[in-house]
From Swiss-Prot:
Superkingdom of source: Archaea
Binding residues for [4Fe-4S] cluster: 29, 33, 36
Cofactor stoichiometry and binding remark: Binds 1 [4Fe-4S] cluster. The cluster is coordinated with 3 cysteines and an exchangeable S-adenosyl-L-methionine.
Keyword terms of this UniProt record: 4Fe-4S, Iron, Iron-sulfur, Metal-binding, Oxidoreductase, S-adenosyl-L-methionine
Species this protein is from: Methanocaldococcus jannaschii (strain ATCC 43067 / DSM 2661 / JAL-1 / JCM 10045 / NBRC 100440)
InterPro entries assigned: Aldolase_TIM, NrdG2, Radical_activat_CS, Radical_SAM_PqqE_MftC-like, rSAM
Protein name per Swiss-Prot or TrEMBL: Putative glycyl-radical enzyme activating enzyme MJ1227
EC number(s) recorded for this UniProt protein: 1.97.1.-
Chain ranges passing through the membrane: none
Cofactor or coenzyme needed: [4Fe-4S] cluster
Annotated ranges, domain Radical SAM core: 14-232
């Protein structure tokens, strides 16, 4: 079988915490986040590749982990499972980035011991989902799916991170507090700095980038509910 691939990064030091990773970006997404920095690139780049071709395309001189990202990689269930299996056979830890809408794919990865790290993008407060990311499911349905993934990970010793890109004038402190309360059982919660220049939506390019001290204050709010909280900025990752 062939996976639809948008791009491959041979070496990243930010996508898998504390590891140097190769990142495989799978084509396709079921959301349209206005701040997304991958969407335009993904829509313009697509090629069919076998798993062997994908791994032959990666220079493993420095990478010691594999990240499967997107788009939304779980839309290509068979490809995700085959890539993860191939990576594990080669001895690599595997991380997947997901919006949480397909817990059944994560469940199969966990059941077959093909995944070590799950990072879930929590886009906004769940009651704002339909409006904010233009998805089919309502926020309550997505919330339940995300909570199912967190529960699966916790029961099977798979590290689970939740993360939110904080967009000023669209989100506020109450949003972060509501999200943190909801995903309080995750192993790590990351608040990420919005970068307007990379936004897919032209209107979002006009919004300000949140200041680091603002993110730190938001991190303190999240810390009331979650032990491990970090902020991710253009200057690096910082524990709260």
């Amino acid at each position: 079988m062939k996976a639809l691939v948008s791009g491959i990064v041979d070496l990243s030091t930010i996508d898998y915490p504390k590891k140097a990773s190769a990142v495989i970006f799978l084509y396709g997404c079921n959301m349209k986040c206005p701040y997304c920095h991958n969407l335009k690139f993904m829509l313009e780049h697509k090629r069919g590749m076998t798993v062997e071709e994908i791994f032959n395309d990666i220079d493993f001189l420095f990478a010691d982990a594999i990240v499967i990202s997107g788009g939304e990689p779980t839309l290509q269930k068979d490809a995700v499972i085959e890539i993860a299996r191939y990576a594990k056979e080669k001895g690599f830890p595997v991380k997947i980035d997901t919006n949480g809408t397909h817990p059944e794919v994560i469940e199969e990865l966990i059941k077959n011991k093909l995944i070590d790290y799950v990072a879930i993008d929590v886009k906004c407060r769940f009651d704002k989902y339909k409006e904010f990311v233009k998805c089919r499911e309502d926020g309550e349905e997505i919330k339940n799916k995300i909570l199912k993934i967190i529960d699966l990970c916790k029961k099977n010793n798979v590290f689970v991170e939740c993360r939110t890109t904080f967009v000023p004038k669209v989100m506020d402190e109450e949003d972060i507090e509501d999200i943190a309360k909801t995903v309080k059982d995750c192993d790590l919660y990351a608040i990420q700095q919005f970068e307007p220049k990379d936004a897919y939506d032209e209107e979002f390019k006009k919004l300000p980038m949140p200041k680091e001290n603002e993110l730190r204050e938001l991190g303190k709010i999240a810390k009331k509910y979650i032990d491990n909280v970090v902020i991710r900025t253009i200057n690096g990752t910082f524990e709260i």
